[in-house]
Amino acid sequence: MSTHTARPLGPQLALAGTVGKRVDVLVIGLTSASDGPEIALGDGIVDESVLTGLLDTLVAVGASGKAEETTRIPAPDTLPVDSVLAVGLGSAEKLDAEQIRKSAGAAARSLSGVGTVATTLSVLDLGAAAEGFALGAYRFNEFKSAKSAPGPDAQPVSRVELLVSSPRAKESKETLARSAAIAEAVATAREFVNTPPSHLFPAEFADRAKALGTDAGLKVEVLDEKALEKNGYGGILGVGKGSSRLPRLVRLSYSAKKRNAPKVALVGKGITFDTGGISIKPAAGMENMTSDMGGAAAVVATVVLAAKLGLPVDVTATVPMAENMPSSTAQRPGDVLTQYGGTTVEVINTDAEGRLVLADAIVRACEDDPDYLIDTATLTGAQMVALGNRTPGVMGTDEFRDRVAAISQEIGENAWAMPMPAELRSDLDSKVADLANVTNHRWGGMLAAALYLKEFVADGVQWAHIDVAGPAYNSSGPWGYTGRGGTGVPVRTMISVIEDIAANG
């Protein structure tokens, strides 16, 4: 049983029609242009003469409106706040929801030590502003003692008042509720990823996922190592053999209780720490492998979010959890294992373990006869070589792959559709088993991994595989609404795809 205690994962979000007296800082948007910056429209919430005075001061101190630039100035006596923060939105002609989200996040990150802020960014896009502030204010300091814990001046913003012309309108309330739920789900995924493997191992991860599912009213099933052995989950067991902390398989199911509701299966790789096993990784940077359960974190958060939003879609997450360690009991290069469902696999490289646990979970997920299946994983270093650290790769059945990629780009997670070249498939043939877990060369590694997974997807299922090896974890400096560590990608993509399925089938 987990002893983990949940904590607030972001600021309180509220609607407001005016700048209240308890507000410490007013955040406004500033667009850039060749003839100088302009304050983004505030829908009359702040008097135009006040905005004109603010713009003059901002120009005088060098504010340009460049995207995510922040400039803080003292507030005039006409505003009931201590200061005003202008955050750059970039070109007004190119302004979209994602830029508002990023700029809101940049504003939140710059306002450490501030209690309550109000913002007019919500006039431009309420949902994007709410998500950006909530995600930008996320912090993870759970393992800092009093010696190094942030003091009052470094605490994140605790309350954000989103200014709109009609704060009591049903549409505004619904938009804010949805955005707050999405931000909480992304933060939940981040929290899992950021928790070190000393404190988040398979059994603990399973317990915490179970608790989230139970609280959300989901059907929960947890298979321990004995149940995995009994049912033939050879991929999960093989990967977990080297660790004293034994594997799990978690199933979280949300039912829309609607006749003929579309069925969506989610599968996420849950390697709580990946040393590479016997095919051990280099020491440099291995600490970042705490993020190797980023796919699992995202699907757990997404199925809970689908339930909270009450979407008219049946969603089931199947989540394999294991720790990939080298030891005298670990699987070896050259071993043959049997995946759930009967396919035999020659393990050429024990560091290509993610596809082994995913294959078991995909076969199990397909037994539910889903209409759609999305799997996501920090699967291949080749994803980063091909697409960098911020662009997920999407492979799968052509139509659904393109649909997922397009939606991801619309909401700002920017996944890119990738092919699965048929000529690579024969490179996964084995001389001693049905398949090998890697090819005998380094070309197209991300694509070959997807081809491996394709072998386990049932005929007729619309399938998308999202490789987030780079995008799930930010090991460099913060940007936009993304701090260092877990990013929560691709939670927003998956929930948006599920919403699109609900609307359009």
Curated annotation (Swiss-Prot):
CDD domains: Peptidase_M17. Belongs to the peptidase M17 family. GO terms for molecular function: manganese ion binding; metalloaminopeptidase activity. This is Probable cytosol aminopeptidase. Its cofactor is Mn(2+). Mn(2+) 1 binds at D274, D351, E353. It is found in: Cytoplasm. It comes from Rhodococcus jostii (strain RHA1). InterPro entries: Leucine_aapep/pepB (IPR011356), Macro_dom-like (IPR043472), Peptidase_M17_C (IPR000819), Peptidase_M17_leu_NH2_pept (IPR023042), Peptidase_M17_N (IPR008283). Mn(2+) 2 binds at K269, D274, D292, E353. The active site is at K281, R355. It catalyses: Release of an N-terminal amino acid, Xaa-|-Yaa-, in which Xaa is preferably Leu, but may be other amino acids including Pro although not Arg or Lys, and Yaa may be Pro. Amino acid amides and methyl esters are also readily hydrolyzed, but rates on arylamides are exceedingly low; Release of an N-terminal amino acid, preferentially leucine, but not glutamic or aspartic acids. Binds 2 manganese ions per subunit. Keywords: Aminopeptidase, Cytoplasm, Hydrolase, Manganese, Metal-binding, Protease.
